[in-house]
Amino acid sequence: GIYILLKEVIDNAVDEFIMGYGKRVEIAINYNTGEVSVRDFGRGIPLGKVVECVSQINTGGKFSDDVFQFSVGMNGVGTKAVNALSTDFEVRAYRDGDFSEAFFKRGALVSQKRGKSADSQRNGTFVRFTPDSEIFKKFQFREEHVLRRMRMYAYLNAGLTLDVNGNKIISENGLLDLIHDEAQFEKLYQPF
């Protein structure tokens, strides 16, 4: 279950890449505490919708027919589920020099704030969460499993850079890189 939480947040970042916004996703995982943060450099959640997009069903941007056809996530449910299943959940959206952020505890809104973002902040979304240990008993993210999943995202999205705790994962050739990296053959032949 903890990997599904991670997947749902990353899927939103990948959706931005697929639609032509942002080519980099920064992921930090504390393998001791289970805390995860994901920062994409896409368009950022609309500032007036930050709380709704992570806490109320049927309020995400993926309910637009134009967006839906490109979405890989749960179409408006994913981050809400992550929020509900986390002890702590933080979301911050950056858009055109402004930001909006919200903090939750076990799905309940604790605080929210809007303002001007630092000059260096590019558009995009930041999400930080810790899976609830009362729901996910004795959980622990396994680094090798996380890195393998991130490589799969890279293979399926050529040109996307995933930075996982400082490890850059990128595939320029997509599925060809997957075949090359995973093939057990002595020589990989090029197609005619």
Predicted segments — roles?
Residues V14, R114-F192:
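N-terminal assembly/transducer modules of large multi-domain enzymes
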Residues G1-P131, F136-K137:
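GHKL (Bergerat-fold) ATPase N-terminal catalytic module, capturing the glycine-rich phosphate-binding loop
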